[in-house]
Structures are given as structure tokens and as C-alpha cells.
């Protein structure tokens, strides 16, 4: 007994925190022979694996002879009167022990079976081997340990029910079983290094990986499906960009806008007539899309749309825009803040092209979006990137940045200086050499420069992309860069002009719906 216990401790210590490779070829494949299994075993050992899982007594015997790694042995059978396949008979246990398996795996699920799992575990122990129980539930793990199993494997999770096999491994089962105190091996659908690492972090002592290493038929299929799916033209996305004055509807595929329509944004935001008017813009496109997406000004938190600045657009409180538009369109609808959507568009197809970035749109107001590590950062409250809402010191106290540096802010400062008109007229006056106009624009650029320097310090993106009617107006980026000259070099961001223009939001929101949220 002491000798057996010592062997158990020695082997589990060799496996703790290590990779076990399952060398089980696809049945009747070109690799379904003893020589291939031995080659797999040798390659696994040479590459740093610490254990092998092998099916069939002949394969176990050959691998145990060719490798110094401990072998988990099993025999698979297809029975007419039982769904249990892994080592269902006592004679299977005997054959595996005689073949040299250090560990014998048995199906320990709670299903109809020819021999109780407890008897199989007892026979493994009687023969001086380590008993591994392949289970699918926490209750089965507890029963197997009560029967004397030395190792629990999550092998059967997802393979005992009536429904389709899950795509991902059962990390929840790993976490629950890790609290039982026995040696735990995570197994089943670990098809990436990331998933294997997650299993260890979830509490597994070791991880078995099979198909992703030793089944080229499966690996080829994964890559084939990914390539063919990417090459296949996707269905267009129905996308809307709803602004305070106009609404754009378009069918979008990738960065290509296939068709577009524009209308004046209806009054009575959120009313049934408002929903109906916007939905009617795309009525004859029914059947050409499967998903829809909406870019809107304001705050989007989950499915709830609300105002960040009611002066820009008055939105009914806690308005479920996605649900209302989804019902009208008969399709699932994603709703994204328009500046965040534009940030994604510029990241995917525009000025940033895959770089960590912040996008700022400077027009009637100031909005923004952040993309880091390939992810759109929406934030806990849906307001990430909303630089225009940051409070800054104004002439008479703290005000929103967009009050001073947006199109509305520029027009207001011009009016206070005795010059009525909009931001466009201020730019025209500055271009004509009017000193008052240039001072207003330089002041706006200075306020914005201080804010983006702070943004660089907080987010530290590779670039800050500037768009919007004010941001792209002649000379404004030069003024912004000039104002940034008063800040230290490390705080001066790489300022680049947006490339997608007014289409950034609708392209971005469509791509998010097609790829990011699908």
C-alpha cells in the first residue's frame, strides 16, 4: 500500500502544473495506427509534454515502451445497450494495466452501464494503478472520489446530453471540482493555449489537449472554415446614424456603403411616429440584411439611450432604442454612441488602421471614442471617450469643454464678441485676416490642446484622430498642434486627421454589428 501511494504521489507531482497530450487519432484516418501513435508520443515528449493519454491496449503498450512519460490509458467501445464508451469492462482495466498504463481512465458518469464505476475504480486500485474518473458533473466527481478515484478529469462535460456539444471548455466545472481537494485534470475542448492557461487559473492541476495537437483533420477543418467564412461575402448590415438634424440610413458591408438615404431627423424623439419614420427609410431593404445597428449622439448604456447634454438633443429618459427599433425592423439591433462608432470605423478602416487610438469628433459638440488592444472601450456607464463633457475653467466658472471648443462654443464666443454667425463664419473671418476670429479659434484650440494632453497622459494612445466639421476645418489642426507646443514632448499626442469623414460612424457601427457583437 505504501509503495502504491508513493507511486501515486510521484506521478501526480510530475503532472502538476503540466501539459498532457492526448494521442488519439481520428478513427480510420491515415494516422490511426500504432506507428503514428508512437510518433505522436515521441513528439509530445520532445516538445515538453509531461504525460500522455492514449486509447487502446496495443497503442498504450507501444507508447509506454517508446516514451518515459506516464501514460493515461483507456479503451473505447461502442455498446448497443449503454452510452458509456471509456473503459466500460473489468477486462479492459486488466488489458490496460498489463500494457503498462500508469493511470487508467474510466467513464464515471451517472449513466446506464455494464459495470458500476465503483467496481472499475476498485479493480484499478487492486492492480496497483492510479484510477482516473472521467466525469461531467460535480456530483459525479464526488461519487468517484467516494469510490476511491485518485484523479478527477472533466473529460465528459458536454458529451452526455441530448443537445449539441458546446464549443468551449467547461471552466465552471473545473472551478467547482477544484474545491474537492483531489488531483484535477481539465480535459475536453481545450483548443488554444489561452484556454489551457485559463484551466490552470480556474483550479486545474494539469490539462489534457488532444485535437489541437494530434488531430490534423480537426485542425485543418478549423482553419478551412475560418478562411472560407472570411472569404465569403457577408450580408450587409442595415446601419443608421441618427443626429440632431439629419438621419442617414445605409446598407454597409465592411467599409463599403452599398446604398444610402438621408432624411431630416423627425421631431418628437422616441415617439411611435419618430420610430416609424426612421424605420420607413429602409422599408424596401427588407430581406437584404440580417442585423441592424444605430449610431446615436448621447449616452448608450446597454440598450438604454439617454442625453449627455440635453441642449444638444433632448431624449426621453431611459429610452430603450434598440428594443423599439428592433421591433420595428424585425431584426436584432445594436446601438452605439456615434463617436464611439466613428472611433471603431477609423480604427478598422481609416486613419488609425489597427493602432491604439482615441478618436475625437469636434463639431457642434465634442464626442470621442477609445480603441485599445483591438477592443472598443465603452466604459462602465457607456461614456468612455466623452471628452466634451469634461469640466474646464471658463471665463465665469467651470463649464463643459464643448461649451468652449465646439462649433456651438465658437459661435457663442463670436456672438459675445459682437459678431453673430456660426462656426463656419468664424473660420471664414479668420481666413480673411480678421484678428478677432483668429483669437477665438486659437482660444478654442488651446482649450482642446490642454484636454488632449491630459488624455494622452491617461490613455497614452499611439495616435489621436481628429474629425468633425470643426476638427477638419482648414487650419484648425495646425492651430491645435501649435497649442500643443506649450506642453512637454511626452504629453504631445500624435494628432492625425480622420479619413472616413462623415461616414466614419455608419461604417463603424455596421462593422461592430457584423463582427464585434455578432
Curated annotation (Swiss-Prot):
Which biological pathway?
Amino-sugar metabolism; N-acetylneuraminate degradation; D-fructose 6-phosphate from N-acetylneuraminate: step 2/5; Amino-sugar metabolism; N-acetylneuraminate degradation; D-fructose 6-phosphate from N-acetylneuraminate: step 3/5
Q: Name one GO cellular component term.
A: cytosol
Q: Which GO terms describe its molecular function?
A: ATP binding; N-acylglucosamine-6-phosphate 2-epimerase activity; N-acylmannosamine kinase activity
Region span, ManNAc-6-P epimerase: 1-234
InterPro entries in the cross-refs: Aldolase_TIM, ATPase_NBD, NanE, RibuloseP-bd_barrel, ROK
Q: Which GO terms describe its biological process?
A: N-acetylmannosamine catabolic process; N-acetylneuraminate catabolic process
Name-wise, this protein is: Bifunctional enzyme NanE/NanK
Name the encoding gene, please.
Answer: nanEK
